Amino acid sequence: MDGDLRGDTVHIGGDARQRFHDARGYGYPLGGNDIAVSLVEAAHLLFRGDLDSVDGMGFRAFLTDREAGFAARFLVYVDLRDRGFYLVPDRDPWWRDPGDGDFVVFPRGNTRRDGVVKHRVRVVDERTTLPVDGLSESVLAVVDEESEITYLDIAPETPTGETTLDRPTDVPGVLLDDRVLVWEPPQRLHNAGFYGQPLGGRAADHDALQLSLVEAAYLIDAGVLRLTDATIDDVRARGRLGEGEHFDCRLAVYRALRDAGAVPKTGFKFGADFRVYSAVSSVDDLGHSELLVRVITDTHVFSPGDLSLDVRLAHGVRKRMVFAATDDTDDTIRWLSVSRLTP
């Protein structure tokens, strides 16, 4: 059986509708028994030996005659078919509600007629740049230089928490280098709110709480903390001295997390900006943090390798990786959760 190349589709006659479309989900009907299939579907049919040729080209010639990026899409298509999924190109007329990805994947045992979507898949290679403003809810299929495929699930995130605290007010503190010290602090500030770290160990002769600059700036804004030797502008300036504008971005994200009832703490040892606990009632009964948050700007550009590295690190410590993209006013934060996926 042969196919005819018509632009970006291949037309197949004979018993193609019953054999390929009705039974196995390829292409769309043209009328009678004829169907049109996409180029990647045609390549798969050639690869399997179901088609003999397209315009006289066998599989090898057809594959090498395609545009840049086709090989990666073909590899992902083959992989998902081999995993037992039906899938179609993410465009009309294959799918009634086309998006900006490459494939619409249906649950095992389902076809497009069932109308249930399992994944929207976008295919990239490992050298593709990925602007954060171009990432949407989808599965990113990254094809590396050895043709292995990594699937990353990208989804919007809404951080929430259940931490409540009767916060004190007008607590005095002093600015010391890149932290703020609170002498004789209200115990609930750390014990129930998990703000700061106590100075010294159990044998310390002085009761003091160390606050990071981000924590201090947030607590000053909230009316909890009052500096006796500096202002909030001094705290911000000290933060910018070491981080530049990233300090303001981190502060905006910290504020959003705290205001949502979550508890962000430094994520330095995990290579992130914050580790986040959804609920803290006492530091003596502290569970594991659930999220790692990396703060970026809304103009950030990922490489697939860096994205995969962050996700693998979070997975290795049993956390989810979340990216918080701030705009130039720090008023709007876009949250994206990225995790590894096995289709």
Swiss-Prot record:
<dbReference type="InterPro" id="IPR036740">
    <property type="entry name" value="tRNA_intron_Endonuc_N_sf"/>
</dbReference>
<feature type="active site">
    <location>
        <position position="288"/>
    </location>
</feature>
<dbReference type="Pfam" id="PF02778">
    <property type="entry name" value="tRNA_int_endo_N"/>
</dbReference>
<dbReference type="Pfam" id="PF01974">
    <property type="entry name" value="tRNA_int_endo"/>
</dbReference>
<protein>
    <recommendedName>
        <fullName>tRNA-splicing endonuclease</fullName>
        <ecNumber>4.6.1.16</ecNumber>
    </recommendedName>
</protein>
<dbReference type="GO" id="GO:0016829">
    <property type="term" value="F:lyase activity"/>
</dbReference>
<dbReference type="GO" id="GO:0008033">
    <property type="term" value="P:tRNA processing"/>
</dbReference>
<dbReference type="GO" id="GO:0006388">
    <property type="term" value="P:tRNA splicing, via endonucleolytic cleavage and ligation"/>
</dbReference>
<dbReference type="InterPro" id="IPR006676">
    <property type="entry name" value="tRNA_splic"/>
</dbReference>
<comment type="similarity">
    <text>Belongs to the tRNA-intron endonuclease family. Archaeal long subfamily.</text>
</comment>
<dbReference type="InterPro" id="IPR023516">
    <property type="entry name" value="tRNA_splic_arch_long"/>
</dbReference>
<comment type="subunit">
    <text>Homodimer.</text>
</comment>
<feature type="active site">
    <location>
        <position position="277"/>
    </location>
</feature>
<dbReference type="GO" id="GO:0004519">
    <property type="term" value="F:endonuclease activity"/>
</dbReference>
<dbReference type="GO" id="GO:0005737">
    <property type="term" value="C:cytoplasm"/>
</dbReference>
<dbReference type="InterPro" id="IPR036167">
    <property type="entry name" value="tRNA_intron_Endo_cat-like_sf"/>
</dbReference>
<dbReference type="InterPro" id="IPR011856">
    <property type="entry name" value="tRNA_endonuc-like_dom_sf"/>
</dbReference>
<dbReference type="InterPro" id="IPR006677">
    <property type="entry name" value="tRNA_intron_Endonuc_cat-like"/>
</dbReference>
<dbReference type="InterPro" id="IPR006678">
    <property type="entry name" value="tRNA_intron_Endonuc_N"/>
</dbReference>
<dbReference type="GO" id="GO:0003676">
    <property type="term" value="F:nucleic acid binding"/>
</dbReference>
<keyword id="KW-0819">tRNA processing</keyword>
<dbReference type="GO" id="GO:0000213">
    <property type="term" value="F:tRNA-intron endonuclease activity"/>
</dbReference>
<comment type="function">
    <text>Endonuclease that removes tRNA introns. Cleaves pre-tRNA at the 5'- and 3'-splice sites to release the intron. The products are an intron and two tRNA half-molecules bearing 2',3' cyclic phosphate and 5'-OH termini. Recognizes a pseudosymmetric substrate in which 2 bulged loops of 3 bases are separated by a stem of 4 bp.</text>
</comment>
<feature type="active site">
    <location>
        <position position="319"/>
    </location>
</feature>
<keyword id="KW-0456">Lyase</keyword>
